[in-house]
From Swiss-Prot:
Species: Equus caballus (Horse)
Biological role: Transcription factor involved in osteoblastic differentiation and skeletal morphogenesis. Essential for the maturation of osteoblasts and both intramembranous and endochondral ossification. CBF binds to the core site, 5'-PYGPYGGT-3', of a number of enhancers and promoters, including murine leukemia virus, polyomavirus enhancer, T-cell receptor enhancers, osteocalcin, osteopontin, bone sialoprotein, alpha 1(I) collagen, LCK, IL-3 and GM-CSF promoters. Inhibits KAT6B-dependent transcriptional activation.
Subcellular location: Nucleus; Cytoplasm
Keywords: Cytoplasm, Differentiation, DNA-binding, Methylation, Nucleus, Phosphoprotein, Transcription, Transcription regulation
Post-translational modification note: Phosphorylated; probably by MAP kinases (MAPK). Phosphorylation by HIPK3 is required for the SPEN/MINT and FGF2 transactivation during osteoblastic differentiation.
Domain Runt: from-to ranges: 1-10
Protein name: Runt-related transcription factor 2
Biological-process GO terms, alphabetical: cell differentiation; positive regulation of osteoblast differentiation; positive regulation of transcription by RNA polymerase II
InterPro entries: AML1_Runt, Runx_central_dom_sf
Amino acid sequence: MRVGVPPQIPRPSLNSAPSPFNPQGQSQITDPRQAQSPPPWSYDQSYPSYLSQMTSPSIHSTTPLSSTRGTGLPVITDVPRRISGASELGPFSDPRQFPSISSLTESRFSNPRMHYPATFTYTPPVTSGMS
């Protein structure tokens, strides 16, 4: 059995009938917006003229004039020398600060799984078959 191609029916062109999307006989909608005036600057302006409008940055010295600030407070680098007993300071130097830390290292929890309850088997509730 041989299958042939059915003859093509000529289709009308898309623009032959007026459609609501392409109304004929109506004038174009005029744009109510006014033309904007050009900005006071121009893209054609060269870089040197841009740079000439800026002032040159002033250079400041980074060295302090004295070791005390304008408020009269000492500079931070002077503070550690003024603390009495600075060499004795260390993290957690007082054992009374965190008394609960020692309880974490007790020997009754040598095995980390011992404080959990024993394993249990799960039995799902019995339900009737598919109904």
